[in-house]
Amino acid sequence: MNHEQPDIESQQSAADAAATAGVNDEVERLRAEIEQVKADALRERADLENQRKRVARDIEQARKFANEKLLGDLLPVFDSLDAGLKAAGDDPHPLREGLELTYKQLLKVAADNGLVLLDPIGQPFNPEHHQAISQVPTPGAAPGSVVTVFQKGYLLNERLLRPALVVVAAD
């Protein structure tokens, strides 16, 4: 009977070792699963944050350019007021002064909403902001510089709304 005792103990030890190994394997599997869940949660949090930033940026862009159509529709009005002031000359007349004040107020309101006037006389030609309609030899002007502006251009929050129509000094 003594001989059977060590067999039972060795079987019990083997069973305990197998059970311990099984538990250790299960613990490792659960740890790996926890790490995977943590990584997935972190990825989801990052995706959510990126989406929040994207939506905020889209809202900001929509706010920035909400006035684009209105201000674009006002450009011919600016042109007409400017032409009227040039036609009136420099004579001090109440109608001319009223027209000039109206034009300045309108330009200020537009500027407060992100509109920037492009009046590039003397500046180098910039194809991103200017549309050349001709080149003329101009003594005293740097080649490639704007010498005449036929129609002023405008930027809205640094984005071109209308290019300036210009004449450029020939090389």
Curated annotation (Swiss-Prot):
Region of interest: Disordered: 1-22
Gene3D superfamilies assigned to the protein according to its UniProt record, in alphabetical order: 3.90.20.20, Head domain of nucleotide exchange factor GrpE (2.30.22.10)
Pfam families per UniProt: GrpE
UniProt keyword annotations, A-Z: Chaperone, Cytoplasm, Stress response
GO cellular component, one term: cytosol
GO terms under biological process: protein folding
Major place of residence: cytoplasm
Span of the signal peptide: none
Location relative to the cell: Cytoplasm
GO molecular function ontology, one term from the record: protein homodimerization activity
Family per record: Belongs to the GrpE family.
Functional description taken from the UniProt entry: Participates actively in the response to hyperosmotic and heat shock by preventing the aggregation of stress-denatured proteins, in association with DnaK and GrpE. It is the nucleotide exchange factor for DnaK and may function as a thermosensor. Unfolded proteins bind initially to DnaJ; upon interaction with the DnaJ-bound protein, DnaK hydrolyzes its bound ATP, resulting in the formation of a stable complex. GrpE releases ADP from DnaK; ATP binding to DnaK triggers the release of the substrate protein, thus completing the reaction cycle.
Subunit details: Homodimer.
HAMAP family per record: GrpE (MF_01151)
Protein's recorded name: Protein GrpE
Lineage: Bacteria, Pseudomonadati, Pseudomonadota, Gammaproteobacteria, Lysobacterales
Name of the gene encoding the protein in the UniProt record: grpE
